[in-house]
């Protein structure tokens, strides 16, 4: 058995980074449609009128699966001498980013899936890099070139087309903030994710990636649970031990969470700047395709046009990244923190 396990490890090490990245991208792209489909299936197993595979149950149990995986991978970073190096400011910012990125933002994304279709969630979620660039200019005072600005503007127009196309009075809709609840949740989640990205880049680069990742997952799961309890009561999680929930979550956790996260981390180990940016570019396209294949969601005219504009913006952004990156940066791995925070949309947790 030991020989077989050792041979399997050797085989995994021989697999090239692009293959791992491609596998992770496919899994992450399918995460939203698969989540929605599993929750739909849960309606056939209702317990006294309650769906045991609810969004909150899936998010909570999925996060527990992810947390277990992160602890196995990153436990060497949790050594006392490393923890003592963190200042009070580090712990405070870690706590803020954990609550925002691992409790509030995912909760909003899951709530959005209840209110609108997956295609809208994917397209409007592309606001995150737009918000990140704007906040970087305002808060970090970074300089941007014209191509980056054009890419951002086109992406923003693409989201606007998705939301406003076919609306009789778009101006009145904006003034009264009369957006769809699901669409609003996605936009707010994108803004929150952008804030955490800025905080991570500005203040948390010196913190070991293992401490950063495990602490975010642990605190985020804890805070999400108590937010849900405060809003809905303990009864909201009364079906969390349901066998049917765990049966599906073992599949979901094994494929979407474990295989997806392991493939992503393995791919990042030796991935180049270009490969990671390509992953970010391809993911939303595949997500829309999976929404059609798994949920039979046919994009509307607004989604087609908005998606084309978003794709154009993403391509221009990719070209800009290639032009501005130094040759040596394009051929070596990214900083581990920057790589892990690459925007590839919802990752299942």
Swiss-Prot record:
Protein topology in the membrane: Multi-pass membrane protein
Entry keyword Transmembrane: yes
Keyword Repeat in annotation: yes
Primary localisation category: membrane
Chain segments annotated as transmembrane: 15-35, 53-73, 91-111, 120-140, 147-167, 179-199, 218-238, 248-268, 276-296, 302-322
Entry's localization field: Cell membrane
Domain EamA: 39-164, 191-319
Keyword terms, alphabetized: Cell membrane, Membrane, Repeat, Transmembrane, Transmembrane helix, Transport
SUPFAM superfamilies listed in its UniProt record: Multidrug resistance efflux transporter EmrE
Family per record: Belongs to the EamA transporter family.
Protein name, UniProt field: Uncharacterized transporter sll1164
Source organism: Synechocystis sp. (strain ATCC 27184 / PCC 6803 / Kazusa)
């Amino acid at each position: 058995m030991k020989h077989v396990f050792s041979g399997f490890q050797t085989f995994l090490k021989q697999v090239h980074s692009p293959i791992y990245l491609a596998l992770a991208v496919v899994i992450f792209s399918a995460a939203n449609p698969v989540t929605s489909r599993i929750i739909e299936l849960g309606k056939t197993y209702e317990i006294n009128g309650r769906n045991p595979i609810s969004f909150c149950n899936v998010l909570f149990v999925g996060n527990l699966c992810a947390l277990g995986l992160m602890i196995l991978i990153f436990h060497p970073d949790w050594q006392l001498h490393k923890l003592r190096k963190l200042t009070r400011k580090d712990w405070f910012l870690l706590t803020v980013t954990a609550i925002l990125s691992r409790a509030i933002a995912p909760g909003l994304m899951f709530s959005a899936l209840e209110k609108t279709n997956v295609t809208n969630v994917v397209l409007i979620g592309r606001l995150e890099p737009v918000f990140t660039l704007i906040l970087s200019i305002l808060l970090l005072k970074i300089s941007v070139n014209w191509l980056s600005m054009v890419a951002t503007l086109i992406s923003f127009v693409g989201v606007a087309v998705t939301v406003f196309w076919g609306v009789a009075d778009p101006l009145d809709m904006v003034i009264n903030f009369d957006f769809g609840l699901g669409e609003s949740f996605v936009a707010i989640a994108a803004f929150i994710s952008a804030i955490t990205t800025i905080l991570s880049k500005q203040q948390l680069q010196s913190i070991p990636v293992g401490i950063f990742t495990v602490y975010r997952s642990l605190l985020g799961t804890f805070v999400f649970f108590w937010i849900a309890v405060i809003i809905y009561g303990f009864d909201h999680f009364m079906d969390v031990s349901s066998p049917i929930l765990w049966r599906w979550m073992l599949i979901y956790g094994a494929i979407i969470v474990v295989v997806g996260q392991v493939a992503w981390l393995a791919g990042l180990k030796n991935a180049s700047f270009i490969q990671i940016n390509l992953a970010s570019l391809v993911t939303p396209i595949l997500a829309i395709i999976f929404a059609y294949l798994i949920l039979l969601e046919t994009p509307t005219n607004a989604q087609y046009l908005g998606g084309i504009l978003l794709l154009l913006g993403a391509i221009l952004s990719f070209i800009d990244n290639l032009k501005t990156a130094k040759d040596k940066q394009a051929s070596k791995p990214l900083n581990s923190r920057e790589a892990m925070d690459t925007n590839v949309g919802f990752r299942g947790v």
